[in-house]
Design a protein with these regions (language model features):
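Small/aliphatic-rich secondary-structure junction motif
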Residues: 2-72, 164-228, 234-235, 245, ...
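Gly/Ser-rich helix-loop-strand patches that form or flank binding pockets
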Residues: 4, 10, 24, 28-30, ...
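A conditional alpha-helix N-cap/helix-loop micro-motif detector
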Residues: 24, 87, 111, 138, ...
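Short glycine/proline- and acidic residue-enriched helix-loop micro-motifs
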Residues: 71-81
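Active-site beta->alpha loop and helix N-cap motifs at the rims of alpha/beta catalytic domains
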Residues: 79-86, 90, 109-110
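A structural motif corresponding to the C-terminal end of an alpha-helix
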Residues: 89-105, 219
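Short, flexible loop segments at the rims of nucleotide/cofactor-binding pockets, characterized by
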Residues: 105-108, 134-137, 175, 223-228
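A short, well-structured beta->alpha microelement
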Residues: 110-117, 223-239
Length: 277
């Protein structure tokens, strides 16, 4: 049973971007499950890509039919129809997922730059969940996800498939304000917690562990601790790879990054990662 605590970082609105790709549908299912557990509102958004619409208006753009493999001119009317159909499929998927999870939900269709529209929607949510790869299906972070992560939104969770989202939480703590928010987020999500203590030496690690333990003791919570002394994200990724189910809660400016960009660091993980920025 989840420990009930008062937390100003409580997650009340969970945003998911839906484009009907397998990865976005997996993100939707995960978001619905989490919304049900946290009694949060599920917010879905589908973005009609303005760049595709402008491209279709050009007289020299061709497309290849999926079934016929024949080349034909890409027409604006056909593009509009395809976008409407995709939005309808996204809305249907949203309704089904919300119904199964029995959560409050809203769904909107926006038109514009995908990154700009999603960042605007994310600014009004407490947590943004998106699939790692989009339509490509590759394990590496997709182009849209990379841009959104680099933009530094509040809290963003990257998932690869339909993972269960309340297993062990591995939150990274280094004493910074961001790591304190990461710890608050872990507290709001669940009681099965591990804390990765990031430190320059063992004395600092002991002090930081005592700091976290004091916070958790006040809330009646316990945690397992792992020290990451002079470590990097690759070492953390290898550590959690041995866990059957794990979500890493990672501060966006963690010392573990060691000069890597966030997208580069995220490519090292095989489990869901929740960024706190």
């Amino acid at each position: 049973m989840r420990q009930k605590v008062s937390n100003p970082d409580k997650i009340r609105r969970i945003l998911v971007a839906i484009d009907a790709s397998p990865q976005s549908l997996a993100a939707l299912e995960a978001a619905a499950e989490l919304a049900a557990d946290l009694d949060a509102e599920l917010v879905g958004v589908y973005v009609e890509d303005i760049n595709l619409i402008r491209l279709a208006a050009l007289p020299v753009v061709l497309e290849t039919g999926e079934a016929s493999a024949q080349t034909r001119r890409l027409e604006s009317s056909r593009m509009d129809r395809q976008l409407r159909n995709q939005a309808a499929r996204a809305a249907q998927a949203m309704a089904l997922a919300a119904s199964r999870a029995q959560v409050r939900w809203t769904f909107t269709v926006a038109r514009g730059s995908i990154e700009a529209e999603l960042l605007h929607a994310a600014s009004e949510a407490d947590l943004f969940i998106l699939g790692r790869a989009g339509w490509s299906g590759k394990r590496r972070l997709g182009s849209t996800a990379r841009k959104l992560v680099a933009a530094g939104n509040n809290r963003t969770m990257i998932i690869e498939r339909g993972e269960r989202l309340l297993p062990t939480l591995m939150t990274v703590y280094d004493g910074s304000d961001q790591s304190k928010r990461a710890l608050d987020t872990a507290i709001s999500l669940g009681e099965y917690m591990a804390v990765g203590i990031v430190a320059e030496d063992e004395d600092q690690a002991k002090a930081l562990q005592s700091e976290v333990a004091a916070i958790l003791d006040l809330l009646g919570l316990k945690a397992r601790y792992r020290w990451l002394v002079r470590a990097d994200t690759r070492e953390l990724a290898n550590m959690v790879r041995t866990q059957e189910e794990c979500i890493v809660i990672l501060p966006g400016e963690s010392p573990l990054l060691e000069g890597k960009s966030l997208p580069e660091a995220l490519d090292e993980f095989e489990c869901p990662v929740l960024l706190v920025q």
